[in-house]
Amino acid sequence: MQNGANSRSQEYQGVSVDSRYDPQAIETKWQQSWAAAQLDRTPEADDRPKFYALSMFPYPSGNLHMGHVRNYTITDAIARVKRRQGFRVLHPMGWDAFGLPAENAAIDRGVQPADWTYQNVAQMREQLKQLGLSYDWDREVTTCSPDYYRWTQWLFLQFFEAGLAYQKEATVNWDPIDQTVLANEQVDSEGRSWRSGAKVERRQLKQWFLKITDYAEELLQDLDQLTGWPERVRLMQANWIGKSTGAYLEFPIVNSSDRVKVFTTRPDTVYGVSYVVLAPEHPLVTQVTTPEQQTAVAAFAAEVSQTSELERTAEDRPKRGVPTGGFVTNPFTGQAVPIWIADYVLVEYGTGAVMGVPAHDSRDFAFAQRYGLPVQPVIQPTEGAIAEPWPAPFTEAGVMVNSGQFDGLSSTEAKAKIIAFAEEQGWGQAHVQYRLRDWLISRQRYWGCPIPIVHCPDCGPVAAADLPVQLPDSVQFSGRGPSPLAQLEDWVTTTCPSCGKPARRETDTMDTFMCSSWYYLRYSDASNPEIAFTKDKVNDWLPVDQYVGGIEHAILHLLYSRFFTKVLRDRGLLSFDEPFKRLLTQGMVQGLTYKNPKTGKYVPSDRISDPSQPVDPDTGDRLEVFFEKMSKSKYNGVDPARVLDRYGADTARMFILFKAPPEKDLEWDDADVEGQFRFLNRVWRLVQTASQVEATTAADDKAEKDLRRAVHTAIQAVTEDLEEDYQLNTAIAELMKLTNALNDAPMPGSPAYLEGVQTLVLLLAPFAPHIAEELWQQLGGERSVHLEGWPVLDESALIVDEIPLVIQIMGKTRGTITVPASADRDQLQQLAENSEIAQRWLDGQTIRKVIVVPGKLVNFVIASP
């Protein structure tokens, strides 16, 4: 590398240098240069350690928002640092391109979903390139491309062959006007269709599921391996899996040979059962309902069937029920207890039946209070008894009472003994249950990956022979009736791959999470036309070393991806247990928001005439002002294109990375954006100066050492900030400190000064790649700054020869002197006593005591007059 004063006139990779900081021109120039040089292409396997940096890929809506910019900039900075630290890096990008918005566009605008999607992909790809993100575009994947979804279908068949994909009846949202199935997001808060306005009905439909419950225990236990994940995310997944240890208990139905089977985590409370509840959909409801209760039970069941699962299980919603008139016998007490149906019991969860113990469960207590059901205490506190009637349920551990042979035991001990007794008597057995349910992947949509199954009257569901099963082109969309695929008779009609007889294709498509549950695997071998990925390549690059994405994906996407990985491992397709070593959930980008507290309406900032005293221009009401997540509905978003047009991508990146730690929410502030632009201009001017000065020999050895110490302190601090927790904001703060030190340097052109300027540019490059590339050329760089090694710390430069020593008299600071860093206690005391400060303040005084704190201060204690 050269220091050359004439570097401005140099040509670097055929690109000329401008003496004025023009971000738009610089960024366009270098983006074109990097693309031509394939600077970001992923290297083949070699002896270097690998690093796989991955951002969650976006849905191609057509425009980037600031949340995207933050996610991708964080990951890009990490990838750029790792490349220069000697890693071979995989840093890809793609598109989660199936989904409902494209189908809605087809209905509303008359465009084909594929055309709408690919147009958006092209637009967003260009926006990403404008940010200077170092993606290997040769590995781009688009989930709606047949080249991709043929492998999604192939993976589905892996599940099918393993017995992990199956069909069963499940409830869907049905629009009675449009005669079509609705996704949950198409149903408003009042339970109406967003398009027709009809009251949505709940119907049973045969659907495809994946047996994720077969992996529930492993998914739970392996969370302990994920030490690089936020504890919050691991806890969310553990709660979603929801392991419960307890028992199945069976209650014989009076006048029947059948039994009601319940699961309970509190078998110690079984003597306190005062009723049993079935889900309205439970298959035994008809049998246990008496003629007198048939009308009431049928009406209640019909009403509940139109209520969403979320509503039925909401904590703050009163629990409602109806007695069936039937009874079961509590086998432990021999007493008959009534059977009810209630809205809060779901047939899909557990056995679809629960035992009601009002004395020891809050929900049961509220239900019993509402319907006048008896409360029978069977556990008392260890110390002191609760007087009846009980004012509230006692839900903690205690001593067994009213429980026959188990009286006097601790409730904890009684659990095991009651389960053992039930097993001996044939009334129940120990059982572990999970809240997690099998994954419903069927969607009655066109714009999704077709499920590659053929339904044969003789053979049943059979795997399609030829993949991909492609979506038909030029489909007409009305938003009414069955799935568009189901209406295409020519497409549906086929022959059975097994027996050759007439058969029909599956017309459901897959949940889009199917496509995103394995895309990170495809990146390892993205262009392979013969297989989804080779075992060698996927085992080479995976697991992902750093995954970056929003907390909103903490459960479904991440859990499904973990499930996919484990199934494919068991199928022999890969050799690791978990897909993502480390996870960073970046905070939200928040915008300044104006809201009328009286009307609840949001007001756009461009309608505010006086930001210091904002009022609603329509009503004159004083507005509330606060920061909230950017969204169109709140009029608080900032268009990335506007920021790039005004300041350039490097300024946007610097602001995004500096404003807040990656995991914290970021409040958008135009003034701070301007501040980053000014900082980059300062760096620009600094390098202009450095590129013109002649190299000199330092005359002031102390100043040179101090400056070199500042340079290597910056190297140390920035490197540490970029390890493990990626504190990118404090790393940029260190660059600002170094810039100040260089601007204050007494001798521009000295070796330490020139080393410092070069180091500043090298450290700046991951954050602001375009300006760093331009400045590196001005400093005489012979190749791209992004190919240069990471600056190496010289620990000897951090050694301090002299340190400040505070002089105190009676604990009050009177001044500071400079002393050798190696001085011992006696030397420090002597230097302090001989200082001008001490001479002035101690003149005529008697020193009673001297306190020396090495490296910090000397305190003189004087005798009282």
Swiss-Prot record:
Subcellular compartments: Cytoplasm
Sequence motif: 'HIGH' region, positions: 58-68
Transmembrane domains' residue ranges: none
Position of sequence motif 'KMSKS' region: 629-633
UniProt cross-references to Pfam families, sorted A to Z: Anticodon_1, tRNA-synt_1, tRNA-synt_1_2, tRNA-synt_1g
Signal peptide annotation: none
Residue positions binding ATP: K632
The protein's Enzyme Commission number: 6.1.1.4
Keywords assigned: Aminoacyl-tRNA synthetase, ATP-binding, Cytoplasm, Ligase, Nucleotide-binding, Protein biosynthesis
PROSITE patterns named among the record's database cross-references: AA_TRNA_LIGASE_I
GO BP annotation list: leucyl-tRNA aminoacylation
Ligase in keyword set: yes
Gene3D superfamilies (alphabetical): HUPs, Isoleucyl-tRNA Synthetase, Domain 1
Catalysed reactions, semicolon-separated: tRNA(Leu) + L-leucine + ATP = L-leucyl-tRNA(Leu) + AMP + diphosphate
Molecular function as annotated in GO: aminoacyl-tRNA deacylase activity; ATP binding; leucine-tRNA ligase activity
Superkingdom classification of source: Bacteria
A single Gene Ontology CC term: cytosol
Record NCBIfam families: leuS_bact
Family the UniProt entry places it in: Belongs to the class-I aminoacyl-tRNA synthetase family.
Listed name of the protein: Leucine--tRNA ligase
Source organism of the structure: Synechococcus elongatus (strain ATCC 33912 / PCC 7942 / FACHB-805)
